Amino acid sequence: MGNHTWEGCHVDSRVDHLFPPSLYIFVIGVGLPTNCLALWAAYRQVQQRNELGVYLMNLSIADLLYICTLPLWVDYFLHHDNWIHGPGSCKLFGFIFYTNIYISIAFLCCISVDRYLAVAHPLRFARLRRVKTAVAVSSVVWATELGANSAPLFHDELFRDRYNHTFCFEKFPMEGWVAWMNLYRVFVGFLFPWALMLLSYRGILRAVRGSVSTERQEKAKIKRLALSLIAIVLVCFAPYHVLLLSRSAIYLGRPWDCGFEERVFSAYHSSLAFTSLNCVADPILYCLVNEGARSDVAKALHNLLRFLASDKPQEMANASLTLETPLTSKRNSTAKAMTGSWAATPPSQGDQVQLKMLPPAQ
């Protein structure tokens, strides 16, 4: 399928050709290593039969797929919204780019609901908080979002304007079927999950306030996690969906009115770029879940940097590089307290092995 030339709205792609690619480059530099680290930490949680790790692992996979598309979008914006990589790549990378928004929102919603069930109904809904259930829910999320956002794969998504710019996944004004699909995305893909997250947060607050056995620090940690999930969706995705809803509603009312499209063109591109910050915010969830997670991640990164800078990488490779996930930190600290009473003093060559009694860990 070739490019289609159309007499569309007069949008100046030169006004915002620096901000989106600059933000995307930042997301690549920060989001790629942190999501790789988050993926590894989530995998460790799955190994410990923790259902939360399944959702976090899927969230990291979605973010990494999204980050892999960003270099082409950097090139697209630096060329003033001119796609030079052909229609096939436009469809594939555009599909991944836009679908990731709703996959990320869905998994953030899953995490929020899972935390609500864990805090408010730990025994009643225990079966819903198993790894098998989380895998099934994740499969449904992927299948639903991929199917719901697959319509662009069956339409031409390259459009050449009067200035010989080839737009990918963009048309000003939009087409009718795109406007209706955008309404579905706004209400079902964005507002519905966000409403569930707000209800989950409200339920978590009620359960935490009514709990006598939960420590104050633990209550603060639970509230912080639930609030951070809502904040990520609000900050990263709300501006984009406000403009998306406005553009779609105005098009359905006045299909060939280009005035609004031309006024919000730059703001729309900026809001779309802001959605990429989700890939940076998601790994921060680990630090918000547990106070010790920040030091654990920093320690792992420090050891990794030492490994890369070391003259003896093999020695560093043999070193133990561990990272306590938020849900295992307490378990590991208890194990250390039990085993910390005894420690072996490393013997010199030819010496007898001596055992040294150490005081219990505090």
UniProtKB/Swiss-Prot annotation:
Effect listed in the UniProt record for changing residue 165 to Y: Displays smaller cAMP, rho, PLC responses to mildly alkaline to acidic pH of 7.1 but almost the same or higher responses to severely acidic pH values of 6.5-6.2
Keywords: Cell membrane, Disulfide bond, G-protein coupled receptor, Glycoprotein, Membrane, Receptor, Transducer, Transmembrane, Transmembrane helix
Main location: membrane
Keyword Glycoprotein: yes
Pfam families (UniProt xref): 7tm_1
Site entry: Required for activation: 145
Keyword Isomerase tagged: no
GO cellular component, one term: plasma membrane
GO BP term, pick one: negative regulation of angiogenesis
Lipid bilayer topology: Multi-pass membrane protein
Extracellular side of membrane: 1-8, 81-85, 157-172, 251-260
Effect in UniProt of substituting residue 85 to Y: No effect on pH-sensing activity
Activity: how regulated: Activated by a network of residues that connects an extracellular-facing cavity to Glu-145, a conserved charged residue buried in the transmembrane core of the receptor. Protonation likely drives conformational changes in extracellular loop 2 (ECL2), which stabilizes movement of transmembrane 3 (TM3) and a series of rearrangements that connect the extracellular-facing cavity to Glu-145, a residue only conserved in proton-sensing G-protein coupled receptors.
Topological domain ranges for the Cytoplasmic compartment: 46-49, 122-129, 211-214, 290-362
Start and end residues of each stretch annotated as Extracellular loop 2 (ECL2): 157-172
Disulfides per UniProt: 9-258, 90-168
Site (Proton sensing) residue list: 155, 165, 269
Span list, region Disordered: 335-362
Stored InterPro entries: GPCR_Rhodpsn, GPCR_Rhodpsn_7TM, GPR4_orph
Domain remark text: A multitude of proton-sensing residues, which include extracellular histidine residues (His-155, His-165 and His-269) or triad of buried acidic residues (Asp-63, Glu-145 and Asp-282), contribute to activation of the G-protein coupled receptor activity and pH sensitivity.
Protein family per UniProt: Belongs to the G-protein coupled receptor 1 family.
Functional note: Proton-sensing G-protein coupled receptor activated by extracellular pH, which is required to monitor pH changes and generate adaptive reactions. Activated by an optimal pH of 6.8-7.2. Ligand binding causes a conformation change that triggers signaling via guanine nucleotide-binding proteins (G proteins) and modulates the activity of downstream effectors, such as adenylate cyclase. GPR4 is mainly coupled to G(s) G proteins and mediates activation of adenylate cyclase activity. May also couple with G(q) and G(12)/G(13) G proteins.
Protein name per its UniProtKB record: G-prodeshotein coupled receptor 4
Organism: Homo sapiens
